[in-house]
Structures are given as C-alpha cells and as structure tokens.
Amino acid sequence: MLGRAVLGLSCSVTLALLAWFTRAQTSDELKHWTKLGTGVYRTNENPYTYALVSGDGALLIDATVPPDVVAELGAKRVEAVLLTHHHRDTARCAEAYRAKKVPVRAPKESGDYLLPEGVAKFWKESVPLRNSRTAYFVLPAGVEGVECTLTDGKSFTFGPWSVTPVAAPGHSRDHFAYLVEPAADAKGPRYLFCGDALHSRGKLWTPYTTDWDHWTEVGLKPTAETLRALARLNPTHLLPAHGPAVREECAKVLTDTADAVDEAAFMKSYERYTKQRLKDEPRYDFLVPREQIASAGDKPWSKVADRLWITGNTYVLQSKTGDGVFVLDPWGQRSADQVEKLRTDEKLGPVELVAFSHAHYDHFDGIHVLKGGDKAEVWSLDTVAAPLKDPTRYRAPFLDPRPIQFTKELKDGETGTWGGYTLKFHHLPGQTFFTSAIETTIDGKRCLFTADNFFHQDQFSGTGGWMGLNRSFPAVYGTSAKKVLDLAPERVLAEHGGPYAFSAEDYRRRVKWGEAAGKAADAVCVSGSHRWDWNPHRVEFEPHLQTAKPGARLAGVIRVHNTSDKSQAVTVTLAGRGVVTDATETLTLPPGARKELTLSALVVATDAKPGRHVIEVRTRDASGSEGCDCFFAVDVTP
C-alpha cells in the first residue's frame, strides 16, 4: 500500500462500481485500457492515463479519464492520482477525482498553475500578456485540494512497487516523471512514466512549450538535460503521455532525443551558428558607439546621420521640409523624456509623425506619454496596427491593454510621404509576425529600418531565436533575410542600438541559418514540420478577450491555419463550462489553407457569475491528439 506518511492518506476512497466490475477484467475484455505488464495499464486514447493496480487499489499517473473508467480494471479504490505536470490535457479530470475525495498529488512547482488562487492570478495577468514568460495549457479554473507537495527523489511504495518522483523540467517548468520498479526485485522491469518529457525517439510533444522566453534556448536546455538524466535511470519501459510505449533501447531513445534537442537549441542563435558552425564570425560595421547596443534608451542620443538619431529602441528623424520630427518606436516615459531633450538640444520642431515597427510594448507604449503625440499622425503597417488598435483581439506577448488609434495603416509595399521622405512599408516577420520594415533614403543613403529583426546582441540577436507564441519561426526569419538581401539597402537601421552598414554576405548567411534552423526544429517535431508543431496559433479564437453581461450574445470567430505541408482534419470543440454555449465543428484543410468559423450562437449563461471566465477551445487532429493551446476569456459584468 502507499506509504501513509508520504501520501497523507488517512483512509481509502471507495469508488461506486457496478457489480460486474468487482473482478479484474482480462485483456480481451478491456474496453478503455491496454495491459502493458503485470498490474500496469494504459488508456487506449491519448493523452494517456496509466494505472498501477494492486489488489483492490489503483494508483493513477495523470488524469485524462474520469473515475468510472478505472472501474473496468477491477479496482475498488483509486488510492491517489499523480500528475506529471499542470497541463490541462493530462490533468483534465483532476477535479472529478477530487470530487470523489481521491487524493490528487502534483509536483511542488505546479501550485501556481493548478490551485484556484494561482490559476486565477495567472489568467488575470495573461490576458493581455505583457511579457513572454508564460505557461501553456493552464486549466480554465483551478482545482481545490490538489496536494502540490511532491519532491524530486522522495520514494514511496504502492503494493509491490517502489515509486520515485523525478524532476523532469523542459516541457514545462513543473514537469515530473515517475520511476516505478519492483520494491523487492532489483532485476524486475523499470517503468518510467515520462509524461511529455518525450514523445518518441527524437520527438517532442508541442515543442513550443519549451519556449520559456521569446528567443533563447532557456527551455530547450533543461529539456535535453532532463532526457539525459532520465536515460541514466536505465528504464526498461518508457511510457509517455502522448507517444507510443518504448520497450527497447530506452536509454538510447532518450539520449538520441537529447541530441536532437541540443541541435535545435544550438540553432536558436544565428550568431552562434555562424561563429561556431560556419567558422565565419559576422563583421558588423556599426554606425553608432557600441554603448547603444542592447541599451534601454538610457544612453545619450547617438547621431546616425545628419538628420537621424538613436537611443535604445527609438529613432528620431528630422523633416527635410521643416523642423518637425518623426519618432519611430517610442518606449515608455524614458523615451518620451529623451525625445523632449533631443528636441531642446537640437532645436527641433514638434513631433509630427509616430510609427511603430512591431507589436512589442517596448516599441510603442511611449505614444501614451509622448509630448505632442496626441496631435501627431500615427502610421504603421496594417499587420502591426491590428493588435495595437485592438489588444484584446489576439493572443500575443508584449502587448499593452491601451488601444492606439491610427491615422494611416499601410499595406505591404505601400508608401507614404512625410517631411520630404518617401517611406515604404514592408511586412518583415521574424522576432514576431507583427513586424514591419520601413525603406527610405536618408542623407543620400538607402536605409532600411528592420525593427528587432537582425539587430546584434552577441549570442542571441534579432536573428533568432524563435518562439511559437510570438508567431516566430526560423523559416520565417530566413524568408525575411532574403527580402533584405534583395532590397540591398546601404544601411540596416536595426533597433536596440544596433544600426550598421549592410553586408550582403552576412545576409546570405542569415538565409542559410534560417534553412538550417528550420530543419533542426523540424527534426524534433512529431509531424516533421515546425510550422505546425511549434505553433500554438494554428487554431485561434478571436477576440481573445471580451466583456459581456449574463444572457448577452458574444462575437466569435475560430480561425484554423494549416501551416503544414499535409492535409489536416481538425475537430474544434468549444467547452463552454456552463458559462457560454458549447460548439463542435470538424474542418478539413489542404496544405497552407486557412478557414474560419463564425460562431453566431454564443450566449453567456444567464446565471454566469461576475468575473473572468476562461473558455477552452479543444482541437484534435486526425491522430486524435490535442496539440494546440487555444482559449479565450470572457469578463462577465453584473
């Protein structure tokens, strides 16, 4: 039996079973389960729940099926449920077990994403999202009574088995695996229930959950370290939450996967790739002192040209037909103060034009405090303007809840004129999809403002890394690098203090990096396509947040984008949780296709309680797997 001191079980919990379930079923009689070994079972549909059965009791790993399904195994009691991590696909039925007083145990680190207080705080801070350090697949509402107390290496017994929790961060920060082996037989099978630490040889499930920030390998590195640590446990069976059971070469499967993950992590940096792999270090001919590189706008202005200045993220360009100025990417109060100081020191005129290169707050939120900004024209590429004028429309990082009004939204390739300059706007996705470049001639030099694409900052530059949540992919970087190569400006006006002279050879290497990084990312994806697997947005609900009263009708559009090179059948289920109307639809999309489904019958329940309600939009592809973290939020008002 489970050690009472460890699991804190004061009594066994009896399940209401039908009489014909009081005996163990044979393998042929099992409807929902497959027998993997003596007393070891797995559900037939993924994500999988695993069960250890000893006598009348069962110990579950993860909670993807309701309690009544366990009765089929002949167990009269579920002694406890052990969660590998907080994700809602593997913890979906945790609340159902708690309702039957079954202990649900989770890693200590899971509390912020499983317990009601932590989950409510997460959703309050995540919509809209002002940073990139987020979590994925969080339950719409927390579960009361989950014991988030499991610690690494503290073993306990259940029946004939010894169960050891093993910290396995990577897929999520709080991820654990469980090593189960016979307590009295050192030569018996060693089952490693590895959750989503591994899908299969060389493959990760939803690799975008390893994007712990928006550009580095901070999540991929512990993923690889975890895989090697698990290999050292010498398991005889690997039992993942989504992938097939592995019974041969388990340690090698884990280390092979670690190698593939290491390669993807290495390729997150163009700088590292070109220095170490190509042995050809980039040669930047910077146009301003290096003190501006990676600065936050706190350095004195540096002069890039007679009429152009930079500090941090912000450029100021003086008109050729007057004394007014164009401010590109004002960032907060510091930037606004710096612009005023520059205007005073250089005897410049008022702010006449403001534009934003991309939809990250450190490049646009200064508009709200910029002196004269309320009287200036405000331009941007239409793709960049979309999330800024309506911050509740999309799920994206680095947004600000204050909407911005635009006087001009330009399309890709469209030009505008101001102060004697012709400004041509280009869509230039890279660090984020919502990015533009602006092409113009300044003091006789052909210039290209490239936003946070292609700036230099040692190992991690604006060329890499990538983040699925940011709609950022290596293949997209490569395409945009090719666009810059074709435009061949004389000067690349990158941000974060890094304008430099254009080098065609450097951009040819960036194109090559995009191709190589894309292949490394593809290699760890179950589908073989990082544009599909590394993308939490392939199914989206718009708007991401709306406010309504009980009984009100909601607006809603589900957009599905098949970013893979194969046809995809996707079933979308809106799980209304009694707050809004449920809905289900199946869409079939050829490669590259987009479809949208307008939900005109969504209604807030008349008894919906005031507050924020998160509604999960479940997606299942032809394999039956849920790989997309889609949801929307409704703030219900009295």
Regions found by a protein language model. Name each.
Residues 57-58, 155-158, 162-267, 324-327, ...:
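Metallo-beta-lactamase
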Residues 66-157, 334-416:
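Active-site HxH/HxHxD metal-binding segment of metal-dependent hydrolases
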Residues 518-549:
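Low-complexity, acidic Ser/Thr/Pro/Gly-rich terminal tails and inter-domain linkers that flank the onset
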Residues 560-564, 605:
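Asparagine-centered strand-capping/turn motif at beta-strand->loop junctions
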Residues 565-579:
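Short acidic, flexible loop segments centered on an aromatic residue
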